[in-house]
Amino acid sequence: MLRVFVLLIFNVNAYCMYLNWTSHDRPNIVMIMSDAFDGRLTFQPGNKVVQLPYINYMRELGSVFLNSYTNSPICCPSRAAMWSGQFVHLTQSWNNNKCLHPNATTWMDDLRKSGYHTHSMGKLDYTSGHHSVSNRVEAWTRDVPFLLRQEGRPVTDLVGDASTKRVMIKDWTITDAAVQWIRNTTASLTQPFALYLGLNLPHPYRTDSLGPTAGGSTFRTSPYWLNKVSYNQVSVPKWLRFKDMHPVDYYSTVTKNCSGHFTEEEIRNIRAFYYAMCAETDGMLGEVMAALRDTGSLNKTVVLFTSDHGDLAMEHRQFYKMSMFEGSSHVPLLIMGPGVKSGFEVSLPVSLVDIYPTVLDLAGVPQTGGLSGHSLIPLISRVSIHSAEPHPAWAFSEYHGCNANTSTYMLRIAEWKYIAYADGLNVPPQLFNLSKDESELRNIASQFPDVCQDLDKLLRSIVDYPSVSKSVHRYNKQQFLEWKQSLGDSYSQVIASLRWHVDWKKDAKSYERDIDEWLLGLD
């Protein structure tokens, strides 16, 4: 027993040496996780379009990761990966309804066990059983051969006036609570604290006019925040013609209700409103930073800012997430605090599963086995560190939810982004050279078959994606069949009332037949 205790103390001290801390002087840890924040806005030239003073402050005094990715571009699976430190296919977090068990171990649990005073506030969204029935059914039926609009058409909504700072009241309320907790609780603590604050912004708001099942397609802000946006810097992204789109991207464009006509003014306004919502998010980050500063905790606290995914904001003729394009999959990741390099940029691809081992290193807690990620501390520490398990040169993401009609797998390495689908045979892959094609408009997979072959081999060493795709396909059918049987005679009425109801009612019987034929192949 004594030997185990001595080894534990040795390990804690060894980890704390990474950042010149002792086991008795561990840092506080504060993580702010937004929702749908485009990571490209956190570094030049992306942040020229909108004023983000507190993100810029973190970048100047800390380290920013230039190629940080979600492990699944949708809310719940992404957060499940971040909290568990495991890839989505390992936890089988297939969609917004199927994620972690409520009792799953998270890095916050490990911090609490190691002596931290822990507190989580706001949006968590990493356990199973949540989100709307419509969202679940759309995910389960994504490979049924019909094409229905599932989202409201993206729109803008300007509220208040030039003095209206608080638009997303729910987020401001929880931010106020976090600020009060810092001001009123932390001073009396005898141990370090770990605070998690989850925000909803800049996720678009639900479009109430579309009914209770509607998704988030309203970009809402006030003149106060819109004034933070340089409107003349807001670009109108180029779109491929429908016939030139990848089949999965075309499906996404239609189901997201973006296949109709949009004027340049509409597109620019949607993007400007989205950037304004990012500015409001930055304002909440600033409130937390001010509370840490005013209580004398800032110089003893490591602060992390990230997001579960981004938002396409009309790039590739889409909004929302659910895509491996940069606007959707590229997330912010900034870390500042004692021992962290200042004004430092990390170009190595990383992802949200890296947060778990990173937080353990920050706290001087020995690493947990079975994690998919790697600690980022050796990359940003002011002290030169030799890592026994250096971070790989790639980042990996996967998607199995709604608004994409097959499972999607993305590998990001060097200048390449490789995207594979389904079993790797029936849907063609995509390959982009991001150093030459930042807008991802030129799929060069057919021009570089050797690169695709090499990257596909690497991808298969990470995940047996044909087998995973088959498992998800089987799960979707089983879940839908159970849901259908539970409804009995009300099935036709209920399925017709979901978010696709506008298109569904045009030929309800035909769509029901499509589903019945799909179910006949139940594995």
UniProtKB/Swiss-Prot annotation:
Q: Which InterPro entries match?
A: Alkaline_phosphatase_core_sf, ARSK, GAG-degrading_sulfatase, Sulfatase_N
| Residues that, per the record, bind Ca(2+) | 35, 75, 308-309
Question: Could you identify this protein by its name?
Answer: Arylsulfatase K
Q: Where in the cell is it found?
A: Secreted; Lysosome
One molecular function GO term is: metal ion binding
Which leading EC class covers this enzyme? hydrolase
Alphabetized, the UniProt keywords read: Calcium, Glycoprotein, Hydrolase, Lysosome, Metal-binding, Secreted, Signal
What does the record note about the cofactor?
A: Binds 1 Ca(2+) ion per subunit.
User: Where, by residue number, is the active site?
Assistant: 75
**Which PANTHER family does the UniProt record give?**
ARYLSULFATASE K
Its cellular-component GO annotations read:
extracellular region; lysosome
Q: Does the keyword Metal-binding apply?
A: yes
The UniProt family comment states: Belongs to the sulfatase family.
Keyword flag Secreted: yes
Q: Which residues are glycosylated?
A: 103, 257, 405
Taking the record's annotation, the residue ranges forming a coiled coil are none
The highest taxon in the source lineage is Eukaryota
Q: Which reaction does it catalyse?
A: an aryl sulfate + H2O = a phenol + sulfate + H(+); Hydrolysis of the 2-sulfate groups of the 2-O-sulfo-D-glucuronate residues of chondroitin sulfate, heparin and heparitin sulfate
The record lists substrate as bound by: 123, 246
Q: What is its EC number?
A: 3.1.6.1, 3.1.6.18
**Residues spanning the signal sequence:** 1-16
Q: Which Gene3D superfamilies match?
A: Alkaline Phosphatase, subunit A (3.40.720.10)
